[in-house]
């Protein structure tokens, strides 16, 4: 099991150096929550929890990242459990996320195994160039939205 904490100001530089915090500006501007997974006092994964999601209006898990060496070891499960607990603690009923319909089958299988189901909305095609950490990144993907009731 991995310890999961909310990102603290004193940890930003250390975490960002190892695990790029792609939504750090959004986190600072909107009061969203960055969750950090730790193993032996080292950051090994993160997830961004936007309290008002971009598509469904529900709290939305975004920007999940786990160090490649620790994928399929329970880090993402620990991050998901922590996000769900925060949503429950605020008295909210559901949490959502989007995942690639075609190019990220392992993540989709993970979320479905955790109880996320298709939200019943039309998949969204994302195409173009985005900037992550100052670098251009070409995107051409179709996202499906999943939802989980946490109460």
Question: Language-model features: where?
Answer:
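Acetyl-CoA-dependent GNAT
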Residues: 2-68, 80-81, 86, 122, ...
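A short, internal acetyl-CoA/4′-phosphopantetheine-binding micro-motif in the GNAT/acyltransferase core
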Residues: 64-71, 99-101
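Conserved acetyl-CoA-binding loop-helix of GNAT-fold acetyltransferases
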Residues: 66, 72-85, 108-113
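Short phosphate-binding/catalytic loops that engage adenosine nucleotides
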Residues: 75, 92, 116
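Conserved GNAT acetyl-CoA-binding A-motif
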Residues: 87-100
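Conserved beta-strand-loop-alpha-helix junction that forms the acyl-donor binding cleft
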Residues: 97-107, 123-129, 137
């Amino acid at each position: 099991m991995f310890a999961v904490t909310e990102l603290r100001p004193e940890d930003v530089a250390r975490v960002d150096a190892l695990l790029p915090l792609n939504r750090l500006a959004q986190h600072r501007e909107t009061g969203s929550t960055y969750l950090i997974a730790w193993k032996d006092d080292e950051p090994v994964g993160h997830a961004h929890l936007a309290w008002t999601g971009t598509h469904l209006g529900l709290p939305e898990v975004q920007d999940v990242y786990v160090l490649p060496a620790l994928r399929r070891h329970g880090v993402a499960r620990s991050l998901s459990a922590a996000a769900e607990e925060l949503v429950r603690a605020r008295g909210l009923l559901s949490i959502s996320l989007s995942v690639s319909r075609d190019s990220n089958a392992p993540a989709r299988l993970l979320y479905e195994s955790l109880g996320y189901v298709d939200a019943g909305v039309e998949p969204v095609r994302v195409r173009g160039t985005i900037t992550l950490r100052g670098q251009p990144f070409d995107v051409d993907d179709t996202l499906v939205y999943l939802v989980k009731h946490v109460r």
